[in-house]
Every structure is written in structure tokens, then in C-alpha cells.
Amino acid sequence: MRDGQQSSFATRMTQEQIDRCLPYYPEAGFYAMEVWGGAVPDSVMRYLNENPWTRLEKIHDAVGNVSKLTALSRGRNLFGYSPYTDEIIDGFCRNAIKSGLGIMRIFDALNDVDNVKSTVKYVKQYGGIADCAVCYTVDP
């Protein structure tokens, strides 16, 4: 629900389109299903005029406990383009877990551990699983 539509449709699948796909996901029985990443919350609000929290809640309601919902977060930048204060990170993580997110995969493009600490702390505090990632490239 995240990468395919992000790569192929510029994160512009409407809630109605997602709703048509949802009945198939519980049957698939995935351990986890990534629903948010990079630009999803921003694009949902900016281009579709939809509520990303409602989207997360509807997906969670449809999938239930069959699959954990996951998100890819940019550490201190969360899903935005600038670093946020701990108060913003706290509220965002609290609402994400409350709305059905089970796992947040967290990275910093510069692999600066200080930029992921707050997000890890709050995800765990609210009962989610913090899944940290490291960025790397293979130089030709």
C-alpha cells in the first residue's frame, strides 16, 4: 500500500481506491504491510485533500490483527522535510500508534543516531515496534 503506489502513482491513490484493495489483504496474511513512507501523509493532505489519520485507521480496521501496519520514517524529520521538536515527534508517534501503526522503520539519511533517538523512544513508549535502518550505497 505504500511503495507500489508511491513509485507508480506518485502517492496519489485515493481512499476510495485503497478501500477497494483492502478486502484482499487479510486473506494474504502478510506479517506486516507498509502503509506510510516518505511523502504519504503530506501527499494525502496536499494533493488529495484527505486525512492521513483516517486513512491509517481505515486500513487498520480492514486488516485487523492479521498484519502489522508499518511506516518508514525519516527520524527527526518524520514524514516532512525539516527536523521537528521532541514535542511534535511525541504527538505524531502517539497518534500513529493509536491510529493502528504497529511498526515504524526509522532511518536518518546521514546515519546520525541523534536524529533517530527521539522517534525510537516515542514509538516504543506508545507500544509500537521501532525498527531502525542504516543507509548505505555501494560505490561503483
Language-model features, listed with the residues they occupy:
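Acidic, glycine/proline-rich low-complexity segments that act as flexible tails and inter-domain linkers
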Residues: 2-11
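Conserved, mostly hydrophobic/aromatic
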Residues: 4, 25, 106
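A common structural microfeature
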Residues: 6, 30-32, 66-70
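Ordered, soluble secondary-structure elements with a strong preference for glycine-centered loop motifs
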Residues: 11-12, 83
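Anaerobic metallocofactor- and corrinoid-dependent redox/one-carbon enzyme cores
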Residues: 15-19
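Terminal or standalone catalytic/regulatory effector modules within metabolic enzymes
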Residues: 20, 24-44
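Active-site beta->alpha loop and helix N-cap motifs at the rims of alpha/beta catalytic domains
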Residues: 37-140
